[in-house]
């Protein structure tokens, strides 16, 4: 049975099997339905619902939900247009917008107590960032051919320094595959751990007696401020992911 109470700061990040598939002939252990699968489906349906069901119902002035959705859309649109520029930004806007909303929603859902932190799993997030990096590299090679490798030679570099700078640029370029996901995962993981630990300590303090409950109200305000900060970080991290994705695409499209 799935335990609904967190007994360890790391319980929120543990993948549990919710439904197993067994067969006397075949091994279906890799097809188990886990908390990771459940929350991935929840995030996907939430993203689809927010984008498909939020309409203005043919009104001149849309609802608050529609206005907020339109504001997010315009923000990402202007960011992609400013980052990629040229005539190609429109081809990649849907990709960046989808990634922004997926990470944004998964971060917000992970803020719900006793929920599962999808974006805190390093393997999953680094896999996403690696796919973006690999896709951008393929786009660059397809568009420019061997000229793509001029990206690793900064303009105006003295000839004796070319081997060293090429090595540095190569290491920096390959590190993008990991750094994009590592940045998001580490921020979400550290923030959630801080909230769980401080929240647990505060709960234990306030449940001891009436006096400690009253004294616990003061640090409770500080904890509430940290929660608000974590909500802000959830939005910022999704936006940073989108900016860096657009920047990587710009580099391979225009080789600078």
Swiss-Prot record:
Cysteine pairings via disulfide bonds: none
Q: Which domain of life is it from?
A: Eukaryota
Protein source organism = Kluyveromyces lactis (strain ATCC 8585 / CBS 2359 / DSM 70799 / NBRC 1267 / NRRL Y-1140 / WM37) (Yeast)
PROSITE patterns with a match to the protein in the record: ATPASE_A
UniProt lists the family membership as follows: Belongs to the ATPase A chain family.
Q: Which InterPro entries does the record match to this protein?
A: ATP_synth_F0_asu, ATP_synth_F0_asu_AS, ATP_synth_F0_asu_bact/mt, F0_ATP_A_sf
Quote the function comment for this protein. Answer: Mitochondrial membrane ATP synthase (F(1)F(0) ATP synthase or Complex V) produces ATP from ADP in the presence of a proton gradient across the membrane which is generated by electron transport complexes of the respiratory chain. F-type ATPases consist of two structural domains, F(1) - containing the extramembraneous catalytic core and F(0) - containing the membrane proton channel, linked together by a central stalk and a peripheral stalk. During catalysis, ATP synthesis in the catalytic domain of F(1) is coupled via a rotary mechanism of the central stalk subunits to proton translocation.
Q: How does it sit in the membrane?
A: Multi-pass membrane protein
Q: Name one GO cellular component term.
A: proton-transporting ATP synthase complex
GO MF terms, alphabetically ordered? proton-transporting ATP synthase activity, rotational mechanism
Q: Which residues form the propeptide?
A: 1-7
| Gene that this sequence comes from | ATP6
Q: Which CDD domains match?
A: ATP-synt_Fo_a_6
Q: Which UniProt keywords apply?
A: ATP synthesis, CF(0), Hydrogen ion transport, Ion transport, Membrane, Mitochondrion, Mitochondrion inner membrane, Transmembrane, Transmembrane helix, Transport
Q: Which residues cross the membrane?
A: 33-53, 92-112, 122-142, 148-168, 188-208, 209-229
User: Mind telling me what this protein is named?
Assistant: ATP synthase subunit a
Q: Which Pfam family is one of those matched by this entry?
A: ATP-synt_A
Task: Tell me where it resides.
Answer: Mitochondrion inner membrane
How this chain assembles, per its entry, is: F-type ATPases have 2 components, CF(1) - the catalytic core - and CF(0) - the membrane proton channel. CF(1) has five subunits: alpha(3), beta(3), gamma(1), delta(1), epsilon(1). CF(0) has three main subunits: a, b and c.
């Amino acid at each position: 049975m799935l335990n609904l109470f967190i007994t360890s700061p790391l319980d929120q990040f543990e993948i549990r099997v919710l439904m197993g598939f067994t067969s006397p002939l075949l091994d279906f252990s890799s097809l188990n339905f886990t908390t990771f699968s459940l929350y991935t489906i929840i995030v996907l349906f939430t993203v689809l619902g927010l984008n498909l069901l939020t309409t203005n119902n043919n009104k001149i002035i849309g609802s608050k939900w529609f206005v907020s959705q339109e504001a997010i859309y315009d923000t990402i649109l202007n960011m992609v247009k400013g980052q990629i520029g040229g005539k190609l930004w429109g081809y990649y806007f849907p990709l960046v917008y989808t990634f922004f909303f997926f990470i944004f929603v998964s971060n917000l859902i992970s803020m719900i107590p006793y929920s599962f932190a999808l974006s805190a799993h390093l393997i999953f997030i680094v896999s996403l960032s690696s796919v973006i990096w690999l896709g951008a590299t393929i786009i660059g090679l397809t568009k420019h051919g061997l000229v793509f490798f001029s990206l690793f030679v900064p303009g105006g570099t003295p000839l004796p320094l070319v081997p060293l700078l090429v090595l540095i640029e190569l290491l920096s370029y390959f590190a993008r595959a990991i750094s994009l996901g590592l940045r998001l995962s580490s921020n979400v993981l550290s923030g959630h751990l801080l909230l769980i630990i401080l929240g647990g300590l505060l709960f234990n303090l306030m449940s001891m007696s009436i006096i400690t409950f009253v004294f616990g109200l003061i640090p409770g305000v500080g904890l509430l401020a940290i929660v608000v900060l974590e909500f802000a970080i959830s939005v910022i991290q999704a936006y940073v992911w989108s900016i860096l994705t657009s920047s990587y695409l710009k580099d391979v499209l225009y080789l600078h």
